[in-house]
C-alpha cells in the first residue's frame, strides 16, 4: 500500500511539473478558435448565456425568419458541446432581444415577414429546465406599448425594460413591465425619461449596477454612431440617461460583452461597410467609461451576430456579411489586460501569423460592377456618385472616398433603395445602391 501511495504521489508530481512546463512554454496568440457550429445559420438572433449554457433564439437565415431555438453547453476547456434544438417560438422573429431572469427567458419585439416589415409588440416567455433545454414558450398577456424592431432589453428592480428600436420611425423611448413572482409580466408603462437620442440596431449591456447603450444607426444618414450613454440601475425605478466616452469607430449592427469592469464593442457596420474591429474600455466606480482602445479583431468582418462572455472566455455566434449568413461559433480567452486571444504552442503562433500574412497578401478580388464617375456629392460619411455605364446611369453610395469626375471605378453589389431621401442632402433619389466597396480601377 505504501509503495502504491508513493507511486501515485510521484505521478501527481510529474503531472504538475509537466503542466507548469507546458504553461511556461505556451505563447499568447491574438486570434480565435473554432467551436461547434449551430444547426442553423442565424443573423439578427438573440444569443445569451445562462449558467454555462449558450442559447441562440430566432433570427434570419438569409431567406426566412426563424422560430427555432438551440443551445450548447460550455465545457470546462471552453469548447462547446454539440448544439441541440429546443422549444420553438410561437412567433418567428428576428432583430429582437431576449434576457434571462430567475430561470425564465423573455423574448420581445423584433420583425418578421418580407424584409422584417411586420413589426412585433409581442413578448414570449419560457422556463429553462434542469437539463438546460427550454420548455414551451408562452405568449405574454400584455404587449409592449410600441412595436420595436431591433429593441434592446435589460432587467432591473424586478422590471423588464425595453428601449429604442424602430416603430415606423426611430425611437428614443423606454418602457418597462413588472415581473411577477410567477414569471409573468404585468402591464407595460412608458418611462418618464427617454434616451439622449434615438437608438436603432445598437447594443445594450448591464455592468456592475449600470446599463450602457452603445452605438446604433444614425437617424438622418445611413451610418453608425460612436455615442454611448448609461444610467444607474437605482432602486427607485427612475432611470436618468447621460452620455459617456464615445467609441473610436462608428457602428451599428454591433454586439458587445462585459468582463470584470471592462466593456467591449464588437464588429458591426458603418454605412455599407462591415467591420471586424473590437474596442474595449474600463468602467469607473461612478459608471463613467474611460478611453476606448482597440484589441484583437474578429476573424472576419460581420454584423448582427451574438456574443457572450463566460468566465474568461468570449464567444462569437452566427452573424452575416457580404459572403452570407453564418452558423459558426468561435471563442477566445480574455487575458488580465482585457485583450483577446488564446494560449498555444509556438507552432500554432507561426501558423496563425502565416494565415494573417496570407490574408494581407491575397490579391484584390475584382468587383462585379464598374463605370465612369459622372458626378460626386460628398457628405461627412458618404460619397454619392453618379456612375455612367455606357448609355445608362446609376447613383451609388458608399463610405467616403476621394473620386473625381472622369475616374473609372469599380464597386461591389449592394442594397438598392427606391425613392431614398437623404436628410443630409435634402434630396430624394429615384434609385440608389448602397455598396460596401468602391475603388479606382487599377
Regions found by a protein language model. Give the residues of each.
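Structural detector for short beta-strands of small beta-barrel domains
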Residues: 364-379
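Kelch-like beta-propeller repeat domains
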Residues: 20-356
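Beta-strand/loop nucleic-acid-binding surfaces
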Residues: 392-402
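Bacterial N-terminal signal peptides that target proteins for export
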Residues: 1-8
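Bacterial N-terminal signal peptides
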Residues: 8-17
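Flexible glycine-rich surface loops and low-complexity tracts that mediate binding to linear polymers
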Residues: 406-422
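Short peripheral tails and domain-boundary helices/loops at the edges of structured domains
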Residues: 426-442
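Short aromatic-glycine-enriched beta-strand elements
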Residues: 380-386
Amino acid at each position: 500500500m505504501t509503495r502504491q501511495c508513493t507511486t501515485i504521489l510521484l505521478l501527481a508530481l510529474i503531472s504538475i511539473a509537466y503542466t507548469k512546463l507546458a504553461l511556461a512554454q505556451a505563447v499568447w496568440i491574438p486570434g480565435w478558435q473554432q467551436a461547434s457550429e449551430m444547426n442553423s445559420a442565424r443573423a439578427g438572433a438573440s444569443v445569451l448565456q445562462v449558467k454555462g449554457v449558450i442559447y441562440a433564439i430566432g433570427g434570419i437565415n438569409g431567406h426566412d425568419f426563424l422560430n427555432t431555438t438551440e443551445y450548447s453547453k460550455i465545457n470546462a476547456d471552453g469548447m462547446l458541446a454539440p448544439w441541440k434544438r429546443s422549444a420553438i417560438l410561437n412567433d418567428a422573429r428576428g432583430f429582437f432581444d431576449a434576457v434571462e431572469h430567475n430561470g425564465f427567458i423573455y423574448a420581445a419585439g423584433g420583425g418578421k415577414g418580407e424584409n422584417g416589415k411586420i413589426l412585433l409588440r409581442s413578448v414570449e416567455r419560457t422556463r429553462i429546465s434542469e437539463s438546460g433545454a427550454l420548455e414551451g414558450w408562452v405568449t405574454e398577456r400584455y404587449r409592449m406599448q410600441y412595436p420595436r424592431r431591433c429593441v434592446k432589453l435589460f432587467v432591473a428592480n424586478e422590471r423588464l425594460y425595453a428601449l429604442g428600436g424602430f416603430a415606423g420611425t426611430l425611437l428614443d423611448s423606454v418602457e418597462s413591465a413588472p415581473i411577477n413572482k410567477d414569471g409573468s409580466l404585468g402591464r407595460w408603462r412608458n418611462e418618464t425619461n427617454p434616451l439622449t437620442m434615438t437608438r436603432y440596431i445598437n447594443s445594450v449591456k448591464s455592468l456592475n449596477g449600470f446599463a450602457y447603450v452603445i452605438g446604433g444607426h444614425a437617424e438622418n444618414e445611413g451610418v453608425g454612431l460612436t455615442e454611448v450613454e448609461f444610467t444607474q440601475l437605482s432602486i427607485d425605478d427612475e432611470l436618468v440617461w447621460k452620455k459617456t466616452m464615445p467609441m473610436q469607430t462608428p457602428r451599428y449592427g454591433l454586439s458587445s460583452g462585459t468582463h470584470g469592469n471592462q466593456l467591449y464593442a464588437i464588429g458591426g457596420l458603418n454605412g455599407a461597410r462591415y467591420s471586424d474591429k473590437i474596442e474595449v474600455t474600463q468602467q469607473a466606480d461612478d459608471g463613467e467609461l474611460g478611453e476606448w482602445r482597440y484589441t484583437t479583431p474578429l476573424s472576419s468582418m460581420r454584423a448582427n451576430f451574438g456574443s457572450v462572455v463566460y468566465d474568461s472566455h468570449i464567444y462569437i455566434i452566427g452573424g452575416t456579411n457580404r459572403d452570407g449568413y453564418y452558423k459558426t461559433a468561435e471563442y477566445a480567452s480574455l487575458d488580465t489586460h482585457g485583450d483577446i486571444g488564446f494560449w498555444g504552442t509556438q507552432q500554432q503562433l507561426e501558423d496563425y501569423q502565416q494565415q494573417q500574412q496570407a490574408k494581407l497578401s491575397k490579391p484584390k478580388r475584382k468587383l462585379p460592377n464598374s463605370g465612369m464617375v459622372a458626378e460626386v456629392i460628398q457628405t461627412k460619411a458618404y460619397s454619392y456618385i453618379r456612375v455612367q455605364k455606357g448609355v445608362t446611369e446609376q447613383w451609388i453610395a458608399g463610405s467616403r472616398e476621394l473620386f473625381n469626375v472622369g475616374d473609372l471605378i469599380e464597386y461591389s453589389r449592394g442594397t438598392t433603395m427606391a425613392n431614398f431621401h437623404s436628410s443630409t442632402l435634402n434630396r430624394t433619389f429615384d434609385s440608389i445602391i448602397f455598396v460596401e466597396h468602391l475603388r479606382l480601377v487599377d
